[in-house]
Swiss-Prot record:
Subunit of the F-type ATPase which has 2 components, CF(1) - the catalytic core - and CF(0) - the membrane proton channel. This is Putative ATP synthase subunit f, mitochondrial. Belongs to the ATPase F chain family. One of its GO terms (cellular component) is proton-transporting ATP synthase complex. The keyword Transport applies. The lineage of its organism: Eukaryota, Metazoa, Ecdysozoa, Nematoda, Chromadorea. It comes from Caenorhabditis elegans.
Amino acid sequence: MAWFRPPPPHTQLRPWVPDAIFIPISRAVERVGVFFYNRVLNKTEVGLFDKRWNKNVHGPYCHWRYYGKLDTKFMDVKLGDLPAWMARREKTPSAFYNEFMRNIWRVHNLYYSGPVYNNTVKVIFRFIFAYSFLNWLVKSHRYVDFQKTMYHW
């Protein structure tokens, strides 16, 4: 385990690749990243806040909140109004992705963080329970024959 010990003070560590090769390559990769950010990512809406969010109206930004115009909830829609309600929905892939991520953040805020952070032990036991339950669900078909023969030894 000598490789695990820290080196003595003032030890000069030599890079694996000579600096004459490593520095120009890393500089080129850095410049390509800057070029990609300036020419491609900067012209998109990736990573920006929702356009409909207004700090003065809504307060601090929340990922799990929908900042669009409020509409009737699906369970409150009458059958006659269903086609009109569906026509008002945005059906682009980005809208589906945004809705999915909003729900991910909402669940994260409700159960794993939020104003009162959960006890670490509670979160660990939640994951243990989820893992155990999923394993039981996947492997339960193995015990069907045993259940049939339980009273017939």
